[in-house]
């Protein structure tokens, strides 16, 4: 372990650290599919045209795509798995970082609940010494990382400043981006190998069984 790493660890031990995980979000029920799509396509980072045209375009696209998307989600339980999966990631991060102090993860989705406003209010109630912003997008894009961080900073502005218990000077660190981070590519490759192996095993069994 490097001297810098030890110094950082000693400096953070005993602190309350809020880790905010950012992701796209997804509908949590069939009724949420259309408003989720509307939120997605009304984002200026996605469709960069002036209002009211962006609103109109988002309305048209979400209305047309909702029935098809709803049917697709129906094959996986009628909802997106992104929030439960992100909650599992949050729990794992808390376990790994528990020796640094009181570490708590919060989830901020971009286009459906829990939104950044909801996460910011929970972070404020936690009253951390430090905030770590962690977009779960390995590669940077204005439509993902940039949009999520901009949304967060707007939400956080409502929680700080005059008359608020939290200061704007609260230490905040953004982690971006990590497409070549140690272990990342290996982890993705392992998932692909596992998925491919499962698929081909099932395919082979089906073909062999059918051929018998």
Kindly give the residue locations of the regions a language model identified:
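Active-site-proximal alpha-helix that buttresses catalytic centers in soluble enzyme cores
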Residues: 2-212
